[in-house]
Every structure is written in structure tokens, then in C-alpha cells.
């Protein structure tokens, strides 16, 4: 999306997946750096490519680079739009007879990592006999700068929230006496499904991060980490006990309720 918006080439962009035979080395996607770091590199690369397109188009039009514009399909003279050359002809010309290739490389690093922000509110229903927790609704408001792709940003937030819910309530790894994990499939390692979660609402409070591509910040970790304290606080508000170990299972809740009632009795 960053490259498309920068170069104004929505129908001419094809993204190829990484290929270890040809792609540069990449240590991985982590630390909420994909959009913030890689996106900025893509923006710089697209700006440089756009400049190359205009420069070669100006040569073909026999005019100055400063006197042409690019609309995503053609390079044309600013004072005479009828004087133009198509992107296809520019690409063909770049193959021979000219020293301006339509191929660019850029890198980007940032000493800064501006934090995203998120507010989460959980509504739960706790069965004090069985300890079962039903998440009725989870509302979130996220500040990740300017969302590059609003639809994908919303889906990523919803997916991260689901991961956070699983981390809080169900996901756990235990080991037997041999040191082997007992949760060796999704039958034992339970992740939340759609029927386990009520309504999830995500809204965005847009800001502008000048160091990010188009004002974007990261979003990866904050949407996973926020459900934990929100759900934990909701359970504490319901039964009066705060938990300090994850996951907060029905067994732990039922035992906590029994201990509280026993102490009161």
C-alpha cells in the first residue's frame, strides 16, 4: 500500500513473496517494526523510483525533469499535458539506449520506536460455582498513528486481541515428569474460537508520527498485551480476587471463590 500510494501505480504493482535464493537477508518481522521500519524503506524506495520514472520520461520528452509530472500512467509536460509518454514506453526505453534504470534500492533504520497506545475494556460474566468466564464484550481504541490500510489494521487489531484473550484465559504449557509438553495439539492447547468470544469492537484514534510512513506507528504487540489487564481487572471486579499467574483458568477462579467464601464463613 505504501509503494502504491507513493508511486500512484495501483494497477501496475505486483508484490512477490520473499525468496531465499534472491531476496536480501532478513532477520525477521518482530518488535512491531514491519510497517514502521520496512514501510518507511518502501516509501523511500518508491519516491526514488518515481523520480527515476520522471527523469527518464523527461529525457524522452526532451525537457527538464522539473517540467514534467507523473500521474501513475504517463509522464507529461506540466505546461502541455498532451505532450506525454506512457509508463510502458518509459519501461521499454529503460532497457536500452538510456542510462537511467527503473530499478532502485533503499534502506531505512530508525533510532526511535514511538510507542502505540491502546485502551481496552472487557465485560465478563463469571460463574462462581464452576469458575467459567464468558467474555461478553471487548472494546478497544487504538492509536497506531495513521493506519496505512484501515481494513487490514482493524483485522490485525482484532486478531491480536483474540491472542491476548487466549493468553489470559486458556493458553498454557505444562510438562510431565520427563520434561515433555503435555499440550501437544490444539485439543489440549486451547485457543479461543469465535464461539468463545462475544462482541469485539475496535476503533482508532488517529495521530501522526512524523518518523513513520505516512504518519504510521506500530501496532503488533500493543493489541496482544492490552486484553490481559482489562480481563484480569474485570474478573477481579466480579469475584474480589486478583490473579498474578496465567492463564486465569476456571479451576483457579473456583478455588479462589471457595477460599474467599470459606474465609468469610
Residue ranges with predicted function:
Residues 1-9:
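Short, small-residue-biased leader/transition segments that mark boundaries at the very start
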Residues 8-265:
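C-terminal catalytic domains of large/alpha subunits in multi-subunit enzymes
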